[in-house]
């Protein structure tokens, strides 16, 4: 947060200030730092202001003109919010923040199942495209082409059940060809989108969604082997490893 000048307000979701402020060292148990908020206005959007519904997310029209919405997406942390920015009259970018941390946490789904052929992707260990059947048979823990590869671990989120619900809501946006879903730790964005101050309004025209949708499968280990039958419950799932 200190990247931005103190004149930049910090906008947070419901319950954030009570949970995290003051920061450390004033509050030794806080996960935030006092320096993050020093001289800065912290604006918490109350739950009552999320009076719209976009998809299944309670939403707040930030500027009042339909150009940018904050979405109440609790679970990962108290007050976690996502952003939905209009890029053209009919297209949007969904900024998922920490609702997910890897594409395999919310893809594939019944809305967008694994395709027959997954195209080549940057950082891919496959050296080119990959048959969807290989991913289902050799990589996916449940051998299922319509459920995500990963499930969030219990204890990782502030509220595990809420976090899973927020992911379910995000998946519905991800299935829309007019919405580009971006999450904070998605390395597949690098090389597929331009850096600021360039714009991303023409993402659909450039085919960005198609380029990144399955790029995350390039993280999986080609030498993966499924645990023997009957050992799945106790298996070490390091075989579903991600590149660092």
Outline where the language-model segments fall.
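Surface-exposed beta-strand edges and their flanking turn/coil or helix-capping segments
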Residues: 19, 25-26, 83-86, 108-110, ...
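Conserved beta-strand->loop/alpha-helix structural units within folded catalytic cores of enzymes
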Residues: 1, 72-80, 170-174, 184-185
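Generic marker of "main functional regions" within proteins
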Residues: 11-14, 20, 72, 80-83, ...
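Residue-level detector of short, conserved catalytic/binding motifs and their immediate flanks
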Residues: 8, 81, 179
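Catalytic core of the metallo-beta-lactamase
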Residues: 46-108
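Residues that form ligand- and interface-recognition hot spots within folded domains
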Residues: 14, 87, 187
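Cap/insert and terminal regions of metallo-dependent hydrolase folds
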Residues: 90-244
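Metallo-beta-lactamase
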Residues: 3-72, 120-158, 162-165
């Amino acid at each position: 947060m200190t990247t931005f000048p103190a004149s930049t307000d910090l906008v947070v979701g419901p319950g954030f200030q009570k949970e995290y402020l003051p920061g450390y060292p004033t509050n030794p148990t806080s996960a935030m730092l006092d320096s993050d908020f020093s001289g800065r206005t912290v604006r918490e959007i109350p739950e009552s202001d999320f009076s719209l519904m976009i998809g299944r997310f309670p939403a707040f029209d930030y500027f009042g003109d339909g150009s940018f919405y904050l979405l109440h997406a609790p679970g990962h942390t108290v007050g976690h919010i996502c952003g939905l920015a209009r890029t053209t009259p009919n297209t949007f970018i969904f900024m998922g923040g920490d609702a997910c941390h890897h594409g395999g946490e919310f893809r594939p789904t019944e809305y967008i199942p694994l395709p027959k052929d997954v195209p080549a992707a940057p950082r891919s260990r496959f050296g080119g495209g990959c048959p969807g059947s290989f991913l289902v048979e050799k990589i996916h823990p449940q051998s299922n082409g319509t459920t995500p590869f990963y499930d969030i671990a219990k204890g990782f989120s502030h509220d595990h059940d809420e976090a899973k619900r927020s992911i379910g809501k995000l998946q519905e946006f991800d299935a829309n060809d007019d919405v580009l879903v971006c999450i904070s730790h998605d390395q597949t964005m690098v090389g597929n989108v331009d850096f600021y101050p360039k714009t991303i309004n023409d993402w659909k025209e450039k085919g960005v969604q198609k380029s990144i949708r399955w790029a995350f499968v390039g993280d999986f280990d080609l030498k993966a082997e499924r645990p023997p039958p009957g050992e799945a419950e106790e298996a070490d799932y390091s075989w579903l490893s991600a590149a660092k």
